[in-house]
Amino acid sequence: MNTHPSHPDHPADTLPARGNREGTTARTYEVRTFGCQMNVHDSERLSGLLEEAGYTAAGEGDTPDLIVFNTCAVRENADQRLYGTLGNLRAVKENHPGMQIAVGGCLAQKDKDTVVKKAPWVDVVFGTHNIASLPTLLNRAEHNQKAEVEIVDSLEQFPSVLPAKRESAYAGWVSVSVGCNNTCTFCIVPSLRGKEQDRRPGDILAEVQALVDQGVSEVTLLGQNVNAYGVNFVDPELERDRSAFSKLLRACGDIEGLERVRFTSPHPAEFTSDVIDAMAETPNICPQLHMPLQSGSDRVLKEMRRSYRSAKFLAILDEVRAKIPHASITTDIIVGFPGETEEDFQATLDVVEKARFTSAYTFQYSPRPGTPAADYENQVPKKVVQERYERLMALQERICEEENQKFIGQTVELLVQAGGGRKNDATKRMSGRARDGRLVHFTPVGTIDGEIRPGDVVTVEVTEAKPFFLIADAGVLTHRRTRAGDNSAVGQVPTTAPIGVGLGLPRIGAPVPAPATPDNACGC
């Protein structure tokens, strides 16, 4: 579907952001993100596009001239959250002349014209495949004085060929692919984001290098199924390569200044030993693996079209722990999939007990229109789902605490975060992530080289363990100031210029050089 397609010769398409038309201040914007890490990264691209078009980020507490929602469609409450928020904004918009509201992302791709039917005060609706159209659509909506809805069925531009304004001075997302070739019966994502298309390795590494050149020390490689990377390169000159992801991980190990590399999410059916070997043998690959289980019942896995069974899943974990003994393993689990029996659920509990996950993202199944599972007749009653969910949560919480107790007395290295703890102001603590991804709240006293900033690196001794975090109150053992910390202190975040090839386009030249190092950077 392509509703109201763009026309390059449309007089509204070339208008700048409204605030600049008569010498007034630039219009302000805010991007609100619902959903997964892929959406967070897409929102960085949206921010980059808007700033390139002349918008500026709204100040905290200010009412922006433009609000962009980047939405999720995975669970039912995502719909409710969006439309509830849009309802609250109706009066705000009426009291703020010229304000615009745009809705994009997976829910917009799914609902299309339904968005403006439910919320007629929305100005622009765009999908997952045409985020580059947003500035044009905003100008056209103002020019035509009506909502502009543009949803396209295939990717117009690979997101990496768009500019990005990053959210963090010290950690960055880098997409390795878009789309997914799996057909899980509960998941709507493939129908919204399309078939998998993989970036060239050189383009990915160029983007990683651009981030590192600006002080970023941790990068997370993103894809709907990262370990399938290499099955369908967007560059037709590159041949299919089943070992491409392990090669990419090893190449990241050669980037000087890149201290931590993570990736998400893999798929158990395609997770291979060469990736585990690359993790074990590449020092900057973090000892952390997110491996979605979804269910411990082989019967349910078959109904989900998850092309692995519990024995294979546990065998992967065994191999990871044999080669990376200190690895932290996290997972996703769905409770109450249609037809799930008590026996099926018990199988999930059994796998969770054996797997000893560091943490688990547990979800109560919610039917998504357009997915096969939504039409299954044997939906599990809500009350039963809730009871099972609570049992699973109790089991996983016990395991989390037992595993975290093992860290008491150990020394861990932390990349200091901005925020991270709801009680940090009251407890006078700061927060950071260990190399294995565990969240640690620490007291910033001891061996400190000036103020500790987000992006700096500290080592601490763990003194207490809770189910979902560790505490280190014995003081800081070492503190290393970093360029990322320098940038955090002055509110500077990286920007990345367009990198790589567009879809079906020939190769382009070298990426635009990264911005120069700020004068106050320590260079370490």
Swiss-Prot record:
For this protein, the record's HAMAP family field holds: tRNA_metthiotr_MiaB
User: Keyword Signal: yes or no?
Assistant: no
Q: What does this protein do?
A: Catalyzes the methylthiolation of N6-(dimethylallyl)adenosine (i(6)A), leading to the formation of 2-methylthio-N6-(dimethylallyl)adenosine (ms(2)i(6)A) at position 37 in tRNAs that read codons beginning with uridine.
Q: Known InterPro entries for this protein?
A: Elp3/MiaA/NifB-like_rSAM, Methylthiotransferase, Methylthiotransferase_CS, Methylthiotransferase_N, Methylthiotransferase_N_sf, MiaB_methiolase, rSAM, rSAM_horseshoe
Could you give the cofactor binding note from the entry?
Binds 2 [4Fe-4S] clusters. One cluster is coordinated with 3 cysteines and an exchangeable S-adenosyl-L-methionine.
Q: Which residues form the MTTase N-terminal domain?
A: 27-143
User: What is the E.C. number?
Assistant: 2.8.4.3
Reactions it catalyzes: N(6)-dimethylallyladenosine(37) in tRNA + (sulfur carrier)-SH + AH2 + 2 S-adenosyl-L-methionine = 2-methylsulfanyl-N(6)-dimethylallyladenosine(37) in tRNA + (sulfur carrier)-H + 5'-deoxyadenosine + L-methionine + A + S-adenosyl-L-homocysteine + 2 H(+)
Name of the protein in its database record: tRNA-2-methylthio-N(6)-dimethylallyladenosine synthase
- Enumerate the UniProt keywords alphabetically: 4Fe-4S, Cytoplasm, Iron, Iron-sulfur, Metal-binding, S-adenosyl-L-methionine, Transferase, tRNA processing
Query: Gene encoding this polypeptide?
Result: miaB
